[in-house]
Amino acid sequence: MVIIQEAPDGFRSLNDCTRIWRDGRVEQLGWPRVKIHYRSGTRIPTGATIEATDSSGAPLRFDVESKLPVPIHVGGGYGGDSDWIHGVWKGEKFAERLTYDMNDPAIIGRSAFGVIDHVGRAVCHDGGKSAEGWGLFEHGALGRHDPSGFTDWLTVAP
């Protein structure tokens, strides 16, 4: 499990990288180095490479792949979702279904302004062994983020 929160200059206010073994042991994996891979022209990750160390100092690498990005503030009510603002009461029997064309520039353009949850596939490379896992890969780079090369709210990946 990796949870990282960084300020615009990359300073980490939250840094947790742990491995949980089948027998319940929890191992801290040091200070992970993260490289997010973005789809060109967007802030939507296609995956990440995470380098960490086990408790003995030996290197570990995680290759994370996005299998399905879901901008949770496009129709999900999070953040500044213009269609369903989080917590807005629309009536006792209100029901609605909306369909979004994620290729529409007006829709996908909203992705840069909120968190994106991904169906994530990760492979942990530990020495000569590899192990595959699946889970949530959640990402958001809002505004300036120097480590990603984003100088302001509108900068996107090359």
Predicted segment positions?
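Structured soluble/peripheral alpha/beta segments that form catalytic or ligand/cofactor-binding pockets
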Residues: 1-158
